[in-house]
Swiss-Prot record:
Name recorded for this polypeptide: DNA primase
Residue ranges of every copy of the Toprim domain listed in the record: 246-327
InterPro entries, per database record: DNA_helicase_N/primase_C (IPR016136), DNA_primase_core_N_sf (IPR037068), DNA_primase_DnaG (IPR006295), DNA_primase_Znf_CHC2 (IPR036977), DnaG_bac (IPR030846), DnaG_HBD (IPR031988), DNAG_N (IPR013264), DnaG_primase (IPR050219)
Species, as recorded: Helicobacter pylori (strain J99 / ATCC 700824)
Transferase recorded as keyword: yes
Gene Ontology molecular function terms on file: DNA binding; DNA-directed RNA polymerase activity; zinc ion binding
NCBIfam families: dnaG
Residues the record lists as binding Mg(2+) 1: 252, 296
Cofactor binding note from Swiss-Prot or TrEMBL: Binds 1 zinc ion per monomer. Binds two Mg(2+) per subunit.
GO biological process, one term: DNA replication, synthesis of primer
Taxonomic classification: Bacteria, Pseudomonadati, Campylobacterota, Epsilonproteobacteria, Campylobacterales
Summary of subunit composition and partner proteins: Monomer. Interacts with DnaB.
Named cofactor requirement(s): Zn(2+); Mg(2+)
Gene that encodes it: dnaG
GO CC annotations, alphabetized: cytoplasm; DNA-directed RNA polymerase complex; primosome complex
EC identifiers of the protein: 2.7.7.101
C-alpha cells in the first residue's frame, strides 16, 4: 500500500492546473480557471478549477475532486494507477507499506496540541517576547506564524493532556536517553517555529536558542511527516500570494520570512536551514512563478546562490539572485525601516544564467592565461545546456568577463560587408546613413528587418551572426518566434501580410546595419546607468563607440 503521508505530499506538491491543463484547455477567469467539462457534453464552460485549494468542480454535472480523482476519471484508471502516473510525471517518490494503510490525523493533532503548548509558554515569557520584538516582529506576526517557546513546563502539559509519548518520540518532539529509559524535551529553552505542510498541517518544528555555545537552530529529525529537503517555511501562508503575484522570494531564515510578510512581501518563504534541492522544485514551480533568491552576500551565501542558480538555470526558471552585502539581510533592512530600499533591491535580480557565469569567472585567476582557458571551457560547457538562441545571448557576457576576443567564442568580429553587385551594375561605396531625422522609427525598422528574414530564410543565418533578440525593443517576441521556427505565430503572419513594409532588392544589409546602429546608440545612454563595475562600463562604452564609427562608415558590426 502507498502511505497516506506519501499521498498527502504528492497532492501538496503538484499543481492541479498543470495536471488538468494537459488534458483540457483551461482559461483564467478571475481567481479560478474554466473549461468545458470533459465529463459531459456542453457548449459553455462550467468546469471550474481552483488552483489554491487544489480541486475542480463542474457546475453542470457535479463532477468534483482533486488531481488524483481527475486522472482516475479522465483516463479510467484505478486509484493506485493514477497515483503512480502522477508521481512518475512530477518525479515524486511514493512510499509503500505492506501492512496497515496509515492515517496521520492523530499525528497532525498531536503536533498541533504541542504547538499550542509552545505558544502559551511564549506569552508567559516576557524575556523571549521582548527579544522577538527587538528583532522587529510585531505581536500580530508572532501570532500569525504561531511562534512559541519550549520550557520545562511543556513536560507537564504533555502529561496533563495525556499526549502519546511514544508518538511524540517518533515525531521528534521528545528524545529518549540511551542510558536511561527516560524522555527529554528535544527543543528545551528554544524559541519555536512550527513548520507546516503546504496544506497547513503542522509537520515539525524549528527551534532557536539564545545561548551562545549551543547550535543556533535545530529542526525536527527526519520522520514520516517531516522531510526538510522538500518543505518550505511559510509556504502555507505564502502560496495564495505566490499564485496571484506570479513571484516567490526564497530567503535563508525563518525571521526573514516573518519580517518580509510583516512588511507586505507575503510571497516570501525559506528553506529549512538546507540548500535548495531538486526536491523543493515541484513546490516552487507550482503556478509557474518568477523565483527570487534572496541570500547573504558572504561566501556561504554566494556558494548557496551559485548551486541553486545552477539548478534553476538548467530548469530555465524565470527570476534571479539578490545578494545582500555588508552584513545586511532582509530582516535587518525591515527592522531599520529600509523597506523602499529593499523593494528596489528585489526589483533588480541577476538572472540565474548570468549569475552562474559571473560566479564561474570569479573562481579563476584570470591574469593567468591557463586559468582563463579553464574558465572559458567551464562557462561554455555550462552554456551547452541551453538553446543556441540563449547561448548567443550570453556569449558576449563571457567575452566581457574574460576580456577575450569575440571570435574565440564563435561570435563574428566586426567586418566590412561586401555586397554582391550584378555585373551590369557599378559597385558603389556602402551608403552612409542620413541624419537621424530622416531615419525610420525603431519599431518600423524592426518590422522591416523581420519581414526581410521571413521573405528570405537564408538571410537568418547572416543575421544571427550579428544580432540577438536583445536588439529588438518592440518586436523581440517576433524575432524569438522566427529563430524557433514558429512560423505560424500570429504576429509573424501579420508581419508577412503587412503591405506597408517596402522591401527593396538587396536592401536587407542596409536595414540590418541601421538596426545595429540604433542598438549601440541606445547602449551609449544605458551603460552609464547600469549596475556594472566602472571597468566593465569603460569596456562596453569603448566598444559601442567603435562600433558606431564603423557602422556609419558602412560596415556590419556584430553585437
Amino acid at each position: 500500500m502507498i502511505l497516506k503521508s506519501s499521498i498527502d505530499r504528492l497532492l501538496q506538491t503538484i499543481d492541479i492546473v498543470e495536471v488538468i491543463s494537459s488534458y483540457v484547455d483551461l482559461r483564467k477567469s478571475g481567481s479560478n480557471y474554466m473549461a468545458c467539462c470533459p465529463f459531459h457534453e456542453e457548449r459553455s464552460a462550467s468546469f471550474s478549477v481552483n488552483q489554491v485549494k487544489g480541486f475542480y468542480y463542474c457546475f453542470g454535472c457535479g463532477a468534483s475532486g482533486d488531481s488524483i480523482k481527475f486522472v482516475m476519471a479522465f483516463e479510467k484508471l484505478s486509484f493506485v494507477e493514477a497515483l503512480e502516473k502522477l508521481a512518475h510525471r512530477f518525479n515524486i517518490a511514493l512510499e509503500y507499506d505492506k501492512g496497515v494503510y496509515y492515517d496521520h490525523k492523530e499525528d497532525y493533532h498531536l503536533l498541533e496540541m504541542v504547538s499550542s503548548l509552545y505558544q502559551e509558554e511564549l506569552f508567559n515569557a516576557p524575556f523571549f517576547l521582548n527579544y522577538l520584538q527587538k528583532r522587529g516582529l510585531s505581536m500580530e506576526s508572532i501570532k500569525a506564524f504561531k511562534l512559541g517557546l519550549c520550557t520545562n513546563k511543556i513536560d507537564y502539559g504533555i502529561e496533563n493532556k495525556g499526549l502519546n509519548k511514544d508518538k511524540l518520540i517518533e515525531l521528534g518532539v521528545l528524545g529518549k536517553s540511551d542510558k536511561e529509559d527516560k524522555t527529554y524535551l528535544r527543543f528545551l529553552d528554544r524559541i519555536m517555529f512550527p513548520i507546516y505542510s503546504p496544506s497547513a498541517q503542522v509537520v515539525g518544528f524549528g527551534g532557536r536558542t539564545l545561548k551562545e555555545k549551543a547550535a543556533k537552530y535545530i529542526n525536527s529529525p527526519q520522520n514520516k511527516l517531516f522531510d526538510k529537503s522538500s518543505l518550505l517555511y511559510g509556504y502555507h501562508l505564502a502560496k495564495e500570494h505566490i499564485y496571484k503575484q506570479k513571484q516567490v522570494i526564497v530567503t535563508e531564515g525563518y525571521l526573514d520570512v516573518i519580517l518580509l510578510h510583516q512588511a507586505g512581501f507575503k510571497n516570501a518563504i525559506a528553506t529549512l536551514g538546507t540548500a535548495l534541492t531538486p526536491s523543493h522544485l515541484p513546490l516552487l514551480k507550482k503556478g509557474d512563478p518568477e523565483i527570487l533568491l534572496s541570500y547573504d552576500g558572504d561566501k556561504a551565501g554566494r556558494n548557496a546562490a551559485y548551486k541553486a542558480s545552477l539548478m534553476l538555470a538548467k530548469e530555465q526558471r524565470k527570476g534571479g539572485v539578490i545578494l545582500f552585502e555588508n552584513n545586511l539581510d532582509p530582516a535587518d533592512m525591515i527592522a531599520n525601516h529600509q523597506i523602499e530600499t529593499l523593494k528596489n533591491w528585489l526589483s533588480r535580480p541577476i538572472a540565474f544564467i548570468e549569475f552562474v557565469l559571473r560566479h564561474m569567472a570569479g573562481s579563476y585567476l584570470l591574469d593567468d592565461p591557463l586559468e582563463k582557458d579553464k574558465a572559458l571551457k567551464e562557462m561554455l560547457g555550462f552554456l551547452k545546456n541551453f538553446s543556441l538562441l540563449l547561448q548567443n545571448e550570453y556569449k558576449p557576457l563571457i567575452a566581457t568577463l574574460l576580456q577575450a576576443p569575440l571570435h574565440v567564442l564563435g561570435i563574428r568580429e566586426p567586418v566590412s560587408f561586401q555586397p554582391f553587385y550584378p555585373k551590369t551594375e557599378k559597385p558603389n561605396r556602402p551608403q552612409k546613413f542620413a541624419h537621424v531625422s530622416s531615419m525610420p522609427s525603431l519599431e518600423f525598422l524592426e518590422k522591416l528587418v523581420i519581414r526581410y528574414l521571413l521573405e528570405d530564410r537564408s538571410l537568418l543565418d547572416l543575421a544571427v551572426g550579428y544580432i540577438h533578440s536583445g536588439v529588438f525593443l518592440h518586436k523581440k517576441q517576433e524575432f524569438d518566434a522566427l529563430c524557433q521556427e514558429k512560423l505560424d505565430d500570429p504576429k509573424l503572419v501579420a508581419l508577412l501580410l503587412d503591405a506597408n513594409l517596402p522591401l527593396k532588392k538587396g536592401g536587407f544589409e542596409k536595414e540590418l546595419r541601421l538596426l545595429i546602429l540604433r542598438y549601440f546608440e541606445r547602449q551609449l545612454k544605458e551603460i552609464p546607468k547600469s549596475p556594472l563595475s566602472f571597468s566593465e562600463k569603460m569596456i562596453f562604452l569603448k566598444r559601442a563607440r567603435q562600433a558606431i564609427m564603423k557602422l556609419k562608415q558602412g560596415e556590419l558590426v556584430a553585437i
